[in-house]
UniProtKB/Swiss-Prot annotation:
This is Probable potassium transporter 3. High-affinity potassium transporter. It is a multi-pass membrane protein. Residues 56-81, 189-204, 254-283, 335-354, 428-439, 486-491 are extracellular. GO terms for molecular function: potassium ion transmembrane transporter activity. PANTHER family: OSMOTIC STRESS POTASSIUM TRANSPORTER, POTASSIUM TRANSPORTER 3-RELATED. The lineage of its organism: Eukaryota, Viridiplantae, Streptophyta, Embryophyta, Tracheophyta. It comes from Oryza sativa subsp. japonica. Keywords: Ion transport, Membrane, Potassium, Potassium transport, Transmembrane, Transmembrane helix, Transport. GO terms for biological process: potassium ion transport. It comes from the Eukaryota.
């Protein structure tokens, strides 16, 4: 499978490090084999879109720029020269040699660049970043040491202190993500329609309408099978694309030799200059077609996390780049000697008659593979947006148990399918779709260039001059291409702009509402002084059981707690405040994921657990969550007692109490139960009849029977692992034993989940725009997205939702 080995295989860094350390040639051979294997696999995942560009580049270039009247050998050579230098400058020089080096712990893409900037400077708009997050292993790149210069310090302060600049940065990132989603709408129609249009070369009776219906049928089938996952056929992706690329290269060589070997001269930029001298404004407008030769380039960086930079470089330099150059050169040789050919089908007309049908079949398969790669990338970008609080919650399904990155979102899938069919039937012509496609491609690359310039300054800590040179060298070229694409806004170029504006509006409104809700929680959180004044009973009735309260606060007590106890003065004997929090790193290691601490003195039995996840982590269903939580709290209690013993902290003073309640510790899942002081038994294990009878006589047996009835109808809840905890007799500290006993008793009594069901309203004094954004747009999105209880896999029978109105 294309991604299986890259996520579970040998780490290139480890191999190189080992090889460098002991000089063993075997390690280097393993490393090279690993790189070549990943390079082979990347052909099917990364380069499917880029490899299908020869189907429509020359057609779009000559039609968009009205170059048919200039179609002579020198102009054709000029078009090829533009394609060659475009492929050399942007995909090869910019992406392969520069951008791929800006990985975020091996991950790439627009959000990887933004994550790097947020971690190395305070550019985030979300106020929930804590100092403890900076202690994560993956937070800073190895060997990072801040180096401040007067210019860098001034630039950093300007961006950090001006909220509008940080908002502009976020909107830029969201715009780039929206354009990637737009690619997911435009790539399937463009690729499939272009491949099927070849049928009209040898079947003149086939009408354009029939080609469109055939293309829509294939697109519907493609989206219908998404829920099955691509892992069953993914092993065919790389062979299909490699055969297609080798075929492109061979056809290119054939056309060069047969039609016009003089096309080799067009590698010189001389023909590029002559092209603009002859064509003028028409030549500039035709850049919108040249732009299509780069479609799919961003995938090299976006899919970096599935492979390695070395493997992607090897695949591009060793196979993709030479095959594409040969194909474009061969088409130019054919065009230069065939001035009367139908430019709409130039690729298929350049194919020798004897192999036309095999090439058409492989072209169709390559188009489907390229479309699948973009669809999967769209699912991935939506997941990342959701993790960072920039997209409404949608359902994420894992289609493979072995490959973590294979995901599927039903809502996004059907939206993409409807949009793809609408584009195919609405625009109909690949030239119009190409105008839209080029706009999206140029926009994504320009966003990457802008973010990359900031990374060069703030992350790599090079001088601003180096960043300026990078920005000028690539940004100016991409801006020229974008300006040419903008000329075709009335002829299809409006589509990616409309799609991007819609998606950016959805993302920003959701992020704005989420941010204002968090600010309200921070401003209205319960004072610890109020908690202390209530005493150990908190002024309410403490009932048996564990109450798990979900909150977005990583510190303090949320207002939902005081709202609940004010209206219903009873709560569980053990309270655990849980904050599921996204941090700006791609992945958080399991042993660093949970921060555990306590709120108030020991006798209050109030704890806090912060669950941290990266923007590429998925919150999968954890059937052992409750048991893991108990074990982690027990581990924290033991760690705290050990620390107290070492530091000789007294427990009878106010100072000790304050110090205790301020502690937070990273607590991994205990591998040794003896460290927790608890014994864990499976149901029925060493359980006496007397114990079972005593348990049945307890009031919570009724609750247990209700749970059992619900489990028969809820397989997901029934899959939760049931165990019984016992306190070991090894404790010498009576406080620890008492606290663990209370924890175990509460766990056996049952667990309830409390979550806020908030209604966000704009204040009456707010502007009309803010009222519309909060009261209408955000409320609509929140009502129609998945609830947080479903996302967090909370059992419905144990969930209590507390309604609150937030005036922001």
């Amino acid at each position: 499978m294309p991604v299986a080995d890259c996520e579970s295989g040998l780490s290139p860094a480890d191999v190189t490090g080992a090889g460098a350390a002991n000089g063993n040639p075997g390690h280097w051979r393993s490393y090279y084999r690993h790189v070549l294997l990943l390079a082979y696999q990347s052909c099917g995942v990364v380069y499917g879109d880029l490899s299908t560009s020869p189907l429509y580049v020359y057609k779009s270039t000559f039609i968009i720029g009205s170059l048919r009247r200039f179609q002579d050998e020198e102009i054709v050579f000029g078009v090829f020269s533009l394609v060659f230098w475009t492929l050399t400058l942007i995909p090869l020089l910019k992406y392969v040699f520069i951008v791929l080096a800006a990985d975020d712990n091996g991950e790439g893409g627009t959000f990887a660049l933004y994550s790097l900037l947020v971690r190395h400077a305070k550019f985030s708009l979300m106020p929930n970043q804590e100092a403890a997050d900076e202690e994560l292993t993956s937070y800073y790149r190895p060997g990072y040491a801040p180096q401040e210069t007067p210019i860098l310090t001034a630039l950093r302060r300007f961006l950090e202190n001006h909220r509008k600049s940080r908002t502009f940065l976020l909107v830029t990132v969201l715009f780039g993500a929206s354009l990637v989603i737009g690619d997911g709408v435009l790539t399937p129609p463009m690729s499939v329609l272009s491949s099927f249009s070849g049928l009209q070369v040898h079947s003149t009776a086939l009408t354009s309408g029939e080609v469109e219906i055939l293309s829509c049928t294939v697109l519907v089938c493609l989206f219908m099978v998404q829920h099955w996952g691509t892992h069953r056929v993914a092993f065919l992706f790389a062979p299909v694309v490699i055969v297609w690329l080798l075929l492109l290269g061979a056809l290119g060589v054939y056309n060069i030799v047969v039609w016009n070997p003089r096309v080799l001269r067009a590698l010189s930029p001389y023909y590029l200059v002559r092209f603009f001298q002859h064509t003028g404004k028409d030549g500039w407008i035709s850049l919108g077609g040249i732009l299509l030769s780069m479609t799919g380039t961003e995938a090299m960086y976006a899919d970096l996390g599935h492979f390695t930079a070395a493997s992607i470089r090897v695949a591009f330099v060793g196979l993709i780049y030479p095959c594409l150059v040969l194909q474009y050169m061969g088409q130019a040789a054919f065009l230069s000697k065939s001035p009367h050919c139908d430019i709409h089908f130039v690729f298929f007309e350049s194919i020798p008659t004897g192999i036309f049908w095999p090439v058409l079949v492989i072209a169709t398969l390559a188009a489907i593979v390229g479309s699948q790669a973009v669809i999967s990338a769209t699912f991935s970008i939506v997941r990342q947006c959701t993790a960072l609080g920039c997209f409404p919650r949608v359902k994420i399904v894992h289609t493979s148990r072995r490959i973590h990155g294979q995901i599927y979102s039903p809502e996004i899938n059907w939206i993409l399918m409807l949009l793809c069919i609408a584009v195919t039937m609405g625009l109909r012509d690949t030239t119009l779709i190409g105008n839209a496609y080029g706009m999206a491609c140029a926009g994504v690359m320009l966003v990457t260039t802008l973010l990359m310039a900031l990374v060069i300054v703030f992350v790599w800590q090079y001088s601003c001059l180096v960043a300026a040179l990078f920005l000028v060298a690539f940004g100016v070229v991409e801006a020229v291409y974008l300006s040419a694409a903008l000329m075709k806004v009335p002829q299809g170029g409006w589509l990616p702009l409309v799609l991007s504006l819609v998606f950016v509006a959805v993302m920003y409104v959701w992020h704005y509402g989420t941010r204002r809700k968090h600010q309200f929680d921070v401003q209205n959180k319960v004072s610890l002084r109020w908690i202390h004044a209530l005493g150990p009973s908190l002024g309410i009735v403490r009932v048996p059981g564990i109450g798990i309260i979900y909150s977005e606060l990583a510190t303090g007590v949320p207002a939902i707690f005081s709202h609940f106890v004010t209206n219903l003065p009873a709560f569980h004997q053990v309270l655990v405040f849980i904050c599921v929090k996204a941090v700006p790193v791609p992945h958080v290691r399991d042993e660093e994921r949970h921060l555990v601490g306590r709120i108030g003195p020991r006798e209050f039995r109030m704890y806090r657990c912060v669950v941290r996840h990266g923007y590429k982590d998925v919150l999968a269903e954890d059937t052992d969550f409750e048991n893991d939580l108990v074990l982690r709290i027990a581990e924290f209690v033991q760690m705290e007692a050990d620390f107290d013993q070492r530091c000789s902290i007294s427990d009878d003073g106010v100072v000790a109490s304050v110090e205790v309640e301020g502690r937070m510790a990273v607590v991994p899942r205990p591998s040794d139960l003896a460290r927790t002081g608890l014994l864990m038994r499976e149901p029925g294990e060493e359980e006496s009849v007397v114990a079972r009878a005593a348990a049945a006589a307890k009031p919570e047996s009724l609750i247990h029977s209700m749970h059992t009835m619900h489990e028969a109808e809820s397989p997901g809840f029934a899959s939760r692992r049931r165990v019984r905890f016992e306190v070991a007799n090894q404790h010498t500290d009576p406080r620890v034993k008492e606290e663990l006993s209370a924890l175990v008793e509460a766990k056996h009594a049952g667990v309830a989940y409390i979550m806020g069901h908030s209604y966000i309203k704009a204040r009456k004094s707010s502007s009309v725009f803010k009222k519309f954004a909060v009261n209408v747009a955000y409320a609509f999105l929140r009502k129609n997205c998945r609830g947080p209880g479903l996302v967090l896999n909370i059992p419905h029978i144990s969930l209590i939702e507390v309604g609150m109105i937030y005036y922001v």
